[in-house]
Amino acid sequence: TTVGTRYANPEKAEVFELGAKIALPSGYLNIAIFDQEIDDFQTNTFVGTGFVLANAGTQSADGYEFDLVYSPTESVDLSISGLFMDSLYDSYVGAAPGDLSGTVPSNTPDDTISSTITWNYNISGWDSFLRISHLYSSEAKLLENPAHQALLVAQGNGFRKQDTLNFTAGFVKDNLSVTLWGKNINDDEFLTAAFIAVADLSETSFFGYPNNYKTYGLTLNYSF
């Protein structure tokens, strides 16, 4: 299909993956390498007065991923997972801003890592835990239109990069559970998405969605 048509063709994917599942004395490790190619990759494209569903010619991605869960002691649990990939529009001739063949799709970081450490303990008869998690993704551009992306970069908002810390502390005794939690405790700030304002003839106004701000909370549960 071309930009502006009502319907998009279905995607056709070809994926090669080779992996292993490894049992550890106190955990496991899953690893895999992959190489995928998607013909008629479906993407939302801005056409001046709105967005339409369009097909890129071919989009490919290759890389590797892993998932590790390990308990070094009876009271400590560790988990870390990661995805490392390179993605590319091999062919995208009919894009709204022109030929995007050879460019990287928006919002596709090369590296994504999630890690968690949990300490389990008992205090005064309360079964308790303390968990800290970290979410990281490397820098990724927000827009695919090179001219629009350049405008955002000039204002210091052209890329998203995540480096977020969360924590949870839980206490359970009999029928009562108490959970204290904090999200984005390091006050990480980034845009999750950005797009040009609809019907802006100058094409210089943009909107964006910020990530969730620092939040704390307390949750109480009682079962009876």
Residue ranges and their predicted role:
Residues I22-Y28, G63, T73-S75, D110-T112, ...:
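Strand-connecting loop/turn motifs
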Residues T2-Y7, V15, T49-N55, A95-P105, ...:
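Extracellular loop and loop/strand-boundary signature of outer-membrane beta-barrel proteins
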Residues D35-E37, A54-N145, T219-S223:
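Gram-negative outer-membrane beta-barrel transporters
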Residues G4, E14-L18, V52, D62-F66, ...:
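Hydrophobic, lipid-facing positions within transmembrane beta-strands of outer-membrane proteins
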Residues L135-N145, F171-F224:
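C-terminal beta-signal and adjacent terminal beta-strands/loops
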